[in-house]
Regions:
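Short, compact, well-ordered microdomains
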Residues: 91-133
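Short, charged/polar N-terminal "headpieces" of proteins
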Residues: 1-47
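Short intrinsically disordered terminal tails
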Residues: 1-2, 133-138
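Amphipathic alpha-helical packing elements
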Residues: 11-12, 36-101
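Generic hydrophobic, helix-prone segments enriched in Leu/Val/Ile
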Residues: 18, 28, 84, 101-107
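Short linear sequence elements within intrinsically disordered, low-complexity coil regions
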Residues: 9, 33, 76, 107-110, ...
Length: 138
């Protein structure tokens, strides 16, 4: 028995369908340096410039929900929650989606990231699609 319903059956039509990711050429990269944790976004469909790659903004994610003044991953702290909000919002373009899923995304995805990582936007969009479309109790 399938645990997912089609996107057309979903009540929340603002939810991104991973097959129609907003920027499938985007890759998020995280690394640690002396200044803390840095997350950048590179879009291979755009020319490399001062704005590509760009830093993922902690401040922008704090305007949605302020959990922490920094990003972090690999553990279940407030920095991981802030990164979860930032990634979900950047991928979905929707603050409500980020707020609905950030705690679960931090627990199941961000917490598992290694010290240095690269994640295509499509992976995050697929995570959203699967959790948004899972049947209750499945």
């Amino acid at each position: 028995m399938a645990h997912y319903m089609s996107m057309s059956d979903s009540q929340n039509r603002r939810m991104p369908d991973f097959r129609e990711a907003r920027c499938p050429s985007r890759v998020y990269e995280g690394s640690r340096d002396d200044g803390g944790c840095v997350v950048t976004v590179f879009d291979s469909a755009l020319p490399q410039s001062d704005s590509n790659p760009r830093a993922l903004s902690v401040a922008a994610s704090q305007s949605i929900k302020d959990c922490c003044a920094r990003f972090d991953w690999g553990r279940g702290d407030a920095g991981a929650l802030q990164l979860a909000i930032a990634l979900l919002h950047d991928v979905s373009g929707d603050a409500d989606t980020a707020l609905r899923w950030y705690e679960h995304f931090a627990k199941t995805y961000v917490r598992q990231l290694p010290a240095t990582w690269a994640v295509p936007e499509l992976d995050i969009a697929l995570w959203l699609y699967c959790f948004q479309n899972a049947r209750p109790g499945a």
